[in-house]
Swiss-Prot record:
Listed SMART domains: CNX (SM00037), Connexin_CCC (SM01089)
Keywords: Cell junction, Cell membrane, Gap junction, Membrane, Transmembrane, Transmembrane helix
Tissues where the protein occurs: Highly expressed in neurons.
Protein name (Swiss-Prot/TrEMBL): Gap junction delta-2 protein
Family: Belongs to the connexin family. Delta-type subfamily.
Transmembrane domains' residue ranges: 20-42, 76-98, 198-220, 253-275
Molecular functions per Gene Ontology: gap junction channel activity
InterPro entries registered for this protein in UniProt: Connexin, Connexin36, Connexin_CCC, Connexin_CS, Connexin_N, Connexin_N_sf
GO CC annotation, single: synapse
Organism: Rattus norvegicus
Gly residues composition bias: residue spans: 125-137
Length: 321
């Protein structure tokens, strides 16, 4: 149960930051109606799945062969695999968004430190720092020059007059640089566009996986679990009858998982409609345009090799004029 709790927390981390309202409803459906029910109820229902699959024969290996024929993949294992695969696009989106946030934080800190180191004398002295005249002004300026910048804070480093003057801290105020603000705004806009594009892509992949597992579940099990299964598979000598434990309960559980998968598909389509098919097309075209621009830049940066022309040169005496 601890593994499911970790997966639930990871999904909540992605949804709380970047998901839409429909995405949050979808997370509730996935967490409550899939993870919790499969982890708690499913293990109880399918605990004796193979041990209680009994065939009316004493032929060695016949029970195992017929069980493999009736259930190529156990219901509970199929649903666990479905949950993991369907949640994989969301986990990839979490990794991408966390990576982009870390990069944005590093850029912001580097911009602040560059601004701090650009003109420390001006920030320490400041306009009017030498004003006041006389010995009093020079003393104040000497004290300011003895301050040091530590992470954007001016800290007094004077050691000779500790008894007479207490340490003082002066917060350095940075004037916003117009070009820096424009660069930060552009980088933030690019980051938001990248995150939105990746979110749309993961919703599309998640919906494709939902539909694939829904179709696979239908072809593997149908809509019901029969109580009696007839089998003539080797090594059974003749056709034997096998009995499945709790067929009605398993049928209800199977139909319930069909309904949950159908609801997830509908919610994914509704989220894509909410995001807008036009935005999805623009996101795909934006990715293609970005790849094209990178290709053009690379071709432009490649050195051009001039090939000498060894053909005939035209002149007034040439016969080809």
């Amino acid at each position: 149960m601890g593994e499911w709790t970790i997966l639930e927390r990871l999904l909540e981390a992605a949804v709380q930051q970047h998901s839409t309202m429909i995405g949050r409803i979808l997370l509730t459906v996935v967490v409550i109606f899939r993870i919790l029910i499969v982890a708690i109820v499913g293990e109880t229902v399918y605990d004796d799945e193979q041990t209680m699959f009994v065939c009316n024969t004493l032929q060695p290996g016949c029970n195992q062969a017929c069980y493999d024929r009736a259930f190529p993949i156990s219901h509970i294992r199929y649903w666990v695999f479905q949950i993991i695969m369907v949640c994989t696009p969301s986990l990839c989106f979490i990794t991408y968004s966390v990576h982009q946030s870390a990069k944005q934080r590093e850029r912001r800190y580097s911009t602040v430190f560059l601004a701090l180191d650009r003109d420390p004398a001006e920030s320490i002295g400041g306009p009017g720092g030498t004003g006041g005249g006389g010995s009093g002004g020079s003393k104040r300026e000497d004290k300011k020059l003895q301050n040091a910048i530590v992470n954007g804070v001016l800290q007094n480093t004077e050691t000779t007059s500790k008894e007479t003057e207490p340490d003082c801290l002066e917060v350095k105020e940075l004037a916003p640089h117009p070009s820096g603000l424009r660069t930060a705004a552009r980088s933030k806009l690019r980051r938001q566009e990248g995150i939105s594009r990746f979110y749309i892509i993961q919703v599309v992949f998640r919906n494709a996986l939902e539909i694939g597992f829904l179709v696979g579940q239908y072809f593997l099990y149908g809509f019901s679990v029969p109580g009696l299964y007839e089998c003539n598979r080797y090594p059974c000598i003749k056709e034997v009858e096998c009995y499945v434990s709790r067929p009605t309960e398993k049928t209800v559980f199977l139909v319930f998982m069909f309904a949950v998968s159908g609801i997830c598909v509908v919610l994914n389509l509704a989220e894509l409609n909410h995001l807008g098919w036009r935005k999805i097309k623009l996101a795909v075209r934006g990715a293609q345009a970005k790849r094209k621009s990178v290709y053009e830049i690379r071709n432009k940066d490649l050195p051009r090799v001039s090939v000498p022309n060894f053909g005939r040169t035209q002149s007034s005496d040439s016969a080809y004029v």
